[in-house]
UniProtKB/Swiss-Prot annotation:
Its EC number is 3.6.4.13. Residues 1-51 are annotated as: Disordered. A motif (Q motif) lies at residues 77-105. It comes from Aspergillus fumigatus (strain ATCC MYA-4609 / CBS 101355 / FGSC A1100 / Af293). ATP-dependent RNA helicase associated with the nuclear pore complex and essential for mRNA export from the nucleus. May participate in a terminal step of mRNA export through the removal of proteins that accompany mRNA through the nucleopore complex. May also be involved in early transcription. It is a peripheral membrane protein. ATP binds at residues 123-130. A motif (DEAD box) lies at residues 230-233. It is an enzyme of class 3 (hydrolase). The Q motif is unique to and characteristic of the DEAD box family of RNA helicases and controls ATP binding and hydrolysis. InterPro entries: DEAD/DEAH_box_helicase_dom (IPR011545), Helicase_ATP-bd (IPR014001), Helicase_C-like (IPR001650), P-loop_NTPase (IPR027417), RNA-helicase_DEAD-box_CS (IPR000629), RNA_helicase_DEAD_Q_motif (IPR014014). This is ATP-dependent RNA helicase dbp5. The keyword ATP-binding applies. Belongs to the DEAD box helicase family. DDX19/DBP5 subfamily.
Amino acid sequence: MASEQPVEAAPTGGSLADRITKPDESNTSETPAPIGDQTDGAPAQLGGSDLHEPEYNVEVKLSDLQADPNNPLYSVKNFEDLGLDPRILKGLSSMNFRKPSKIQERALPLLLNNPPKNLVGQSQSGTGKTAAFVLNALSRVDLSTEQMQKTPQALILAPTRELARQILGVVQVMGQFVDGLIIGAAVPTDRDSRPKRLECSIVVGTPGTVGDMIKRRTFIPNKLKVLVLDEADNMLDQQGLGDQCIRVKALLPRDIQVVLFSATFPEHVHQYASKFAPNANEITLQHEELTVEGIKQLYLDCADGEDKYRTLVQLYGLLTVGSSIIFVQTRAAAQEIERRMTAEGHTVVSLTGERDPSVRDAIIDQFRRGEAKVLIATNVLARGIDVSTVSMVINYDIPELHQPNVPGRQADFQTYLHRIGRTGRFGRVGVSISFVSNREEWEMLNQIQTYFNCEIQRVDTKDWDEVEDIIKKTIKNSRANPKFAGGKD
């Protein structure tokens, strides 16, 4: 699927990045600063959240060890100082970006500098990372001829179809005034449809589909200049999509600029990232500042699996105060809970990986619009998805790592972090509730508390008035107390 934005003519003569070091002063945008907050993740037009700028420091490590990372050349305070095309500036203005966020101040000069350098960025959701790598992609593409407009030059990969669609929406909004820009999606399609040849300048997709399309020659990658991996820790983890990403990269030009962004980088993944993106500049939020703010973390004791379900039904009225996501471990559990709750007259929808892509699209769009307020999901939604109305996340099943040769059950800390990050997004207030029904789940919950040095408060299910009071007060409290610390990696 391709999207073309027919608007006024853009300058010709190669990519914008070729002109960054000597910007034409006549190209300075006169677009007035908009009123309102900056946005990241999904733009406001797609139901996304505002940018959240907590107090944090950005640490820069340059690949050139002789260079000074504090040099003013590696920081920028205004988008106009980057020599950006006025049409891109106009797109930024439409997204309510008045000035670069802290991460953008440091990332954009490094991304846009010539010759292009690889970048590895660790930055939590809501700090402007999506806009940063999209802006770089828009600036690198050459749209001077019709042939180049139909030639893939930038590739953005995401772990799921849902996140890829969200990023594609950001590209469309930011690039809406750029003449000749064509955007293509390389995501799983319904079983009865065949992928068409991609004739576009920027491609957003998932690694498996991109790899298949390159092999079938419906995606010709030989002119690609930029490769971006969002949620890169998951994309490069050998337990996840690592093999697919390696195969895709092997099919791309060797001199391609590689950009990796993620909220978390476990040590073993960070070591591999340095090989995937060699000689990269690195940008990191300082360790102690990696927090999820405004999330009240609670847990409920349940007698057994059936009591979990009855507890969930009891919570239904609270789940619909805003929008809520119920995370389960398996597709079968999602389907069974949806079946039972629907049969009892509750309105819920489920989203799992095996559903046809068109059905998944319809469900997530329905959830964004608020037509469905309770969504049951597997980890397909745990990363990156930005829906501004989500006020509660239920960990029906505590996320765990499957380690066949390791005794006992091990909590998956990073998935927990990403799951609860779906609520309380970018300064909003949210609630996370974990269900505990046996000793092993209790031990995993304790592992999470120890790892993140946080307290998860027990709520007594014998007094549902108290449960309701605690949750409603938290959701309505505009100054919820952040209690979630940064973790160990």
